[in-house]
Regions:
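Helix-loop boundary and gating motifs at the non-cytosolic
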Residues: 27-70
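Cytoplasmic helix-loop-helix junction between adjacent transmembrane helices
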Residues: 126-162
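Helix-breaking motifs and short loop linkers at transmembrane-helix boundaries and internal kinks
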Residues: 61, 93, 114-116
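C-terminal membrane-cytosol helix-exit motif in multi-pass small-molecule transporters
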Residues: 193-214
Length: 216
């Protein structure tokens, strides 16, 4: 009888060391860094977003249709970039792809400071969508890499909150800063600084070596 009871306990996992092991840590250092970098992407992006129509109207006298086209151009290039970003991320070292695309996304904000004719601003703004699209794909891929398989679904859920949190607070902060300073250039430069922080954060992530896809 004693042997039978012991067998039942073992079958239930009471004395099974494997069943007593805790779940792997979700908020590891790499995940926190990638999460923070993603927050910086959307924070810097949304910091200027609500002010762009006002900027284009006041600085260039642009009409509603022109403003809509310029904002639409950013979205289109971001969507097109995302179509190819997955392949690029899998075909080349992820660290290189992420840091390069993130750096381009960051430095494009400096292009807003150049001024010049409306056409030049429209070109800069439209092209800016490409590194935004590729950066979001690359950063999400790295987030998956640094998560333990047992915590991956949960981790992706929390990762998405970084987008939501940045989108919720950044526009209000941008509008408040503009009301205090009354300077569009300051907002553009702050967006550059916040996005540059994201680049620096990601540069400290320990990337897992991905198997590069070879064409056959």
């Amino acid at each position: 009888m004693a042997n039978d009871m012991e067998s039942i306990k073992n079958a239930g996992g009471e004395n099974n060391p494997a069943s007593a092991q805790p779940l792997p840590r979700l908020w590891n250092a790499n995940y926190i860094k990638v999460w923070s970098a993603n927050f910086m992407i959307f924070f810097s992006f949304m910091l200027v977003m609500p002010l762009l129509p006002l900027y284009l109207s006041e600085q260039y006298g642009a009409g509603k249709h022109t403003i809509g086209l310029i904002l639409f151009g950013y979205t289109i290039t971001a969507l097109v970039a995302r179509l190819f970003s997955g392949y690029v991320v899998d075909s080349f070292p992820r660290r290189t792809v992420l840091l390069l695309s993130y750096s381009l996304f960051s430095f494009f904000f400096l292009g807003y400071l150049v001024g010049g004719p409306l056409l030049l601003f429209a070109i800069v703004r439209t092209l800016h969508g490409a590194p935004f699209g590729s950066t979001t794909v690359a950063n999400s891929t790295v987030a998956i890499d640094v998560l333990h398989p047992q915590r991956r679904a949960e981790g992706i859920g929390f990762y998405g909150l970084s987008n939501n949190l940045a989108t919720a607070i950044s526009p209000s902060i941008g509008l408040y800063i503009y009301e205090v300073w009354g300077n569009f250039q300051a907002i553009f430069f702050l967006s550059f600084l916040f996005s540059l922080c994201g680049v620096i954060i990601n540069s400290t992530v320990k990337f897992r070596q991905n198997k590069v896809i070879a064409d056959t």
